Amino acid sequence: PFQNLSQDAASAFYEFALADSVITELAQIRSIIVRPSSVIAKYQGKEVDPREAGRELRVHAVLSAGFIRAGDKLRVTAQLLDVVSGDILWSDRIDAEGSDILALQDGIAHRILEGLRLELTDLEAEKLGKRATDNAEAWEEYLRARDHFGRFIFRTIDAEDCDAAIACFKRAIELDPHFALAYSGLGACYATRVFKGLCEPEDYSYADASFSKAFLYDQHLAVAP
């Protein structure tokens, strides 16, 4: 997870959600293997040595990043570290308006690929160039939802966290009714409640309807959150 260097509680959801969204972006590239969000969740809120974490995860490189939000500005400092040699493969500082988190995420993913000197296929380049939504507010609600859902799945199993995720996914959909990832996330919430025995009677049908909407708006959706 990214480190919240400003210790701003209102921005804490970016810690897991930004890392999670970058993972989702990079997972579309066949030539690299990216560890899923489930394995990074345990590092959230902790001081972690990147090389030690990399050895534990059995990866060749680790992205280490921190962010500071001040007013409407968001600054991310990031570096990609070679786990074996300790060499920095890529490092950069990326500034963005707080309302343009989409551009920030896209920038991080593309600069990592540049640092690794990877050549993309035409289809991979097309996928990376396609935004899940152009609505910045919808994307922020989606990130909040992912943070709540990640907390529910990996840390608390508290129904309130899942309920909060559902509310955020629904707000994202209200802001962008064609937001496939938000429908997919909403479906995952309902399905997880069913699997964990926390469900309401209609949750199964809600999950099915949400996933159907997700694939209606994006038939190539690779990952259901």
Language-model features: locations:
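Acidic, proline/glycine-rich low-complexity intrinsically disordered segments
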Residues: P1-P225
